[in-house]
Amino acid sequence: GGCCSHPACAANNQDYC
């Protein structure tokens, strides 16, 4: 859930997601 559930956010956090 959270950021990793949102493509735009996940794309900016690939190191975490």
Curated annotation (Swiss-Prot):
Molecular function as annotated in GO: acetylcholine receptor inhibitor activity; ion channel regulator activity; toxin activity
User: Where does this polypeptide localize?
Assistant: Secreted
What are the disulphide bonds in this sequence? Answer: C3-C9, C4-C17
| Keyword tags | Acetylcholine receptor inhibiting toxin, Amidation, Disulfide bond, Ion channel impairing toxin, Neurotoxin, Postsynaptic neurotoxin, Secreted, Sulfation, Toxin
Residues covered by region (Ser-Xaa-Pro motif, crucial for potent interaction with nAChR): 5-7
Q: In which tissues is it expressed?
A: Expressed by the venom duct.
A Gene Ontology term for the protein's cellular component: host cell postsynaptic membrane
Q: Which InterPro entries match?
A: Conotoxin_a-typ_CS
List modified residues, type Cysteine amide. Answer: C17
- Residues where Sulfotyrosine is found: Y16
The PTM entry states: C-terminal amidation, in synergy with sulfation, is important for activity and structure stability. Non-amidated conotoxins has a 1.9-fold lower inhibitory potency on alpha-3-beta-2/CHRNA3-CHRNB2 nAChRs (IC(50)=0.54 nM), and a 4.8-fold lower inhibitory potency on alpha-7/CHRNA7 nAChRs (IC(50)=367 nM), when compared to sulfated conotoxin.
Its domain description in UniProt is: The cysteine framework is I (CC-C-C). Alpha4/7 pattern.
User: What family does the Swiss-Prot or TrEMBL record give for this protein?
Assistant: Belongs to the conotoxin A superfamily.
Protein name according to UniProt: Alpha-conotoxin AnIB
Please name the taxonomic classification of the source.
Eukaryota, Metazoa, Spiralia, Lophotrochozoa, Mollusca
